[in-house]
Amino acid sequence: MTIILFLVDTSSSMCQKAYVNGVQKTYLDIAKGAVETFLKYRQRTQDCLGDRYMLLTFEEPPANVKAGWKENHATFMNELKNLQSHGLTSMGESLRNAFDLLNLNRMQSGIDTYGQGRCPFYLEPSVIIVITDGGRYSYRNGVHQEIILPLSNQIPGTKFTKEPFRWDQRLFSLVLRMPGNKIDERVDGKVPHDDSPIERMCEVTGGRSYRVRSHYVLNQCIESLVQKVQPGVVLQFEPMLPKEATSATAGEAAGASTISGMGISSTSGAGPAPDIVFQPVKKMIYVQKHITQKTFPIGYWPLPEPYWPDSKAITLPPRDAHPKLKVLTPAVDEPQLVRSFPVDKYEIEGCPLTLQILNKREMNKCWQVIVTNGMHGFELPFGYLKAAPNFSQVHLYVLAYNYPALLPILHDLIHKYNMSPPSDLMYKFNAYVRSIPPYYCPFLRKALVNINVPYQLLQFLLPENVDNYLSPTIANQLKHIKNTAKQDQENLCMKVYKQLKQPKPPYRQVETGKLFTGAPLRRDLVRHPLLRDIFSKLHGEIDPVENYTIVVPQPTHQSSAKSHRNPFDIPRRDLVEEIAKMRETLLRPVSLVAKDSGHCLPIAEMGNYQEYLKNKDNPLREIEPTNVRQHMFGNPYKKDKHMVMVDEADLSDVAPMKSPNGNGPGGAPPGSPSGSGSPTGPGPSSPGSSPGGGSGPGMPGMPGMGGGMSGLMLGAGGSGGSSKKLDGTSRGRKRKAGPLPRSFEFRRSSTDSRSSSSGSESSTTGSAPGSPIPGATSSISGCDSAMGADGGPSSSCFDEDSNSNSSFVSSTSEASASDSGMSNSHLDPLRISFVFIEEETSDQDTPLNGYVHNFINGISDDAETGETEAVPGGASLPGASSANEPSSIGASPAVSATPATSVIPASNGSEVCSAVAAGSSSSISSSASSPGVLYVPLNGLTTHAAYSSNLGGPSSPLDNLSSLGGAAGGGGSGLLGVSKPGSLPLANGYGHGHSSAISPPSPLSLVPLSPLGTSTPAASSSGLSSSSAYFSHNDINDASEISRILQTCHNGTSSGSSVGAGASNSNLNGNGSTESGGGVSSDDHASLGGNSFDALKRTAGTAGSTAAGNPHYYWASGLNHHNNNNSSAAGAASGSTLSNNHNHRGHNNSSPNKLEVKINSSCGSSPTHNNGGMGSPGQSLPLIFTEEQREAARLHNVELRLQIFRDIRRPGRDYSQLLEHLNLVKGDQDMQSDFVDMCIVESLRFRRHRMASSIQEWWDRKQQLTAVGTNEATPSAEQAVAKS
């Protein structure tokens, strides 16, 4: 905080006038204008925010303080305008009062630190600006020729300093020497110093005086003063030779003073000659604010006191206001500083001393400085002077006292002994501590902490008891002075406040006017010859008047306006006068010369508009107020603020759109946010699922699943990662405002919302990390589903996409518990009617007929009606929902009726893997879907079929998964069979999945399981996933289906299935295999090699786990049917493991002979990865890349990614260039699939759903072309495999 104190001379001599800009002004008015100009210039600088302005006059205290510590800026300006000239020119007393006002605050803040060193960073910079006329100094006892500052002991703490001022207080004076006549104002050169006694006072404090001769010079002086207002302290620099030269010179001078004004004359040759010679000078060192602390400066080292502190002294000797620093000559080498050792650096104001140092231009030389203390007998350096590297300024470096002895000790402590000093180094350090003033110890401790000295060593080197260097008497004295100064300042502020509250006469500025005589009088004013001589004499006596200024008289009494409404209010003596005024007012209502008495206001009151507005009457109301229009339905002027986004991002806000490939509402591809699934890659996982899709806690042995899997896994607490966010595509078209018509039917539009219950998101991406299958995305299919009155679900579905995804939900079952908690989908009791636009038909050329599949599966209409029964209490019907609303509706655990019975809700767009895990908790996450076939395991061997609508053309059915888990104590193994909708369960547990649609029968009542022959499985759970499809029933399709069936049967393939309670028979491809009994062991599976579907089976051993992927070619539709049997056998001590199968394939329904072979042996395996060991002739072999080729392809794709991302960000809907660049992607199937998924995610990040759909469509088409090319190349081989 910078204090700027204006001391304005208010003596009577300030009434003299000066000629300023053609107008005569008094010195006091000029002084007021100078203060206002200073404030205006100061406000342009950066440091003006922390300024405090004070205003003092030459009056007696406390009336001399017009604005002190407590007054604000408004009070300062008001008091400045009201200053008046009266009193004496008591310069000395006024200066003393100004210093005392400043020193009171210093004593209570304690920034002077008496007896504890002098810290330059503890400062309160103050500038005292005296504006006077430079006349004689008149006091009450006479006129004096010099300034006398009276010594007053009223202010506490004055005896500690010899002078009344401090080292951060400077005095400047503006001495007005402006004449009363017109002169040339512009003066070249610098403004001279004044020769009055005030000049010597200014030089003592480190300031100067200005001799002001004109108003132009006054503005120059004010600009100079504004530049000098900088934080800093004033020091006195004196020259000094080394001690031997000083003693030699002292001996020759016979006791005379060796130090003269010009330095030391080196007459003796005992010492070196000084390299710099200068006179003692008082100059300022600038103490700048710290970089990190913008409010106050930060320092580390004090300047030593001029005396050695004595702990037994009862008082402190007085110090000089400005420290006297002795500069040692000649220069010495700059000391080597320790890293992180604190050093204070201050810039020195320009002077002859700094000029000589700069002229030396010595880079590594410095001049040491000391402070003389005659009491102790010797002086040691505490800093040095050194030029800046650019030789533009000189800096004062302040370090510890006797730093030449300290720095080598610290260097050895850090670099030589590594903070483990020996005893001799400790002795040296203790000797150094005893040789410095005690008040340096706290600063030295902070410096040692800065260089990372350990705390234990620091306590040993500098114990805290050395800080008590002041005697108790002096400490108590300083504390008492501080309290007294605080009380005195409060009393002074209260006196100032009271005297400012006293009423003052209003200030009125003197109004002046100039007289212009106009044209000069002509000589021939009178043309008559007899009168010309007489008037010529009178004309000669008239003196010309030029630039004469007169003072306009001010009315002292303002006549109030009179009202003559009541004539009895007029006094009798004023009747005659008032009648004349009334007559004049009546006959002439507007006076030519209006009275201005009502407009005469003081300047200070002219800007007070608030009081005028308060007293002003409110305007009258209107006679006929206008009615304000009320808008009944909102604000008609309010505009819809739709943000303009890039490309087609905001089109879905108006109405849901359909993409060309029918990927759900808004054209969002599956896996995108509008497709209700997490994007590619691992999603948020629940407790029990790792983020990367691997095994999590509570699910031992479970392989890593895809990113879509993580969004569907449920832990013990419920949903993990379920989202409640509504997509922008869920907003339908807005109805126009107005009343509803009578025939209006309310229909709730479909929304892509997520349930807030424990059910997790459905229809997520099914690609596992590491599964490079492109196009393995979820198909959002439309379904109209409603629960009938009798509780039976009815559904009608239509296909909207040619791609379907298999996303997996993992569930585990307790091995020791008698019941398994499962999450079942419950139907919302609210009846909802969904509206869908069935514009697009199925992309399937010849869709499978539902009646044909009923005939194939042996499900007749009679059986359908006969099986419609109530569901047991242990099972819960799967809820019906739309595919456009794939939300999990209230998944809640339910207890099964029998210990080993699992109720599996049909999941639209997702597939459920189930496992038997000993010791793991059971939780099945299911998404709400249309009702489907429930294949309930009977005796662990066969499954019974309830209704399921198999949707989507190229679906990815879940192949049969059997898990063999060892019982807790038995050696046998139980089988858990999971079959696809429409598949034929076999006796050996192999189910054949069909891509078909079965007509909706009634739900199946659960059949209790009979115990197995060898062992009892702990629990069993099965999962089922169905994809939606729409099949039209017409004669052409029926004929096509029948012809396909007959053709296949002609080739010798037949199949039949029987569902029984204890046994199951299955016949596939003419080879029958019958298993009777309760259990199937791994040895049984190994002995099934005679069957045709075991041709690709691979056995890993009798004790290990066996996994086989078997392609079966079913005669129903020309589609591929994969049956993979994953059996895991474990011992009694180990838990069972789960093996899942992701089977992704593309359909080609144009020909029944086009078959595709996929062999998958593990969860997330590639469609082209052969794990069987024996490849069939119809299998498409993958491209095998070496590591070098993969690395080269990866680098190529990285460079290509920049260009493709640039194409994604480019506005517009022409994606031809983007697709051309996508064709340049290199690598195997995994790398290309990952790259396409990354591009889809990037396009969705910019909300470019149509671009993502185009990329997905391009990739699917490319995959289909690849598959078609492979299949056409080997038709005969496929037929041979089918016949085998």
Curated annotation (Swiss-Prot):
Lineage, uppermost ranks: Eukaryota, Metazoa, Ecdysozoa, Arthropoda, Hexapoda
Annotated localization: Nucleus
Name of the protein in its database record: Integrator complex subunit 6
Gene source species: Drosophila melanogaster (Fruit fly)
Subunit record text: Belongs to the multiprotein complex Integrator, at least composed of IntS1, IntS2, IntS3, IntS4, omd/IntS5, IntS6, defl/IntS7, IntS8, IntS9, IntS10, IntS11, IntS12, asun/IntS13, IntS14 and IntS15. The core complex associates with protein phosphatase 2A subunits mts/PP2A and Pp2A-29B, to form the Integrator-PP2A (INTAC) complex.
A Gene Ontology cellular-component term: INTAC complex
SUPFAM superfamilies, per database record: vWA-like (SSF53300)
Swiss-Prot/TrEMBL GO biological process terms: RNA polymerase II transcription initiation surveillance; snRNA 3'-end processing; snRNA processing
PROSITE patterns, per the entry: VWFA
Start-end of Low complexity biased regions: 752-781, 803-824, 1053-1074, 1125-1141
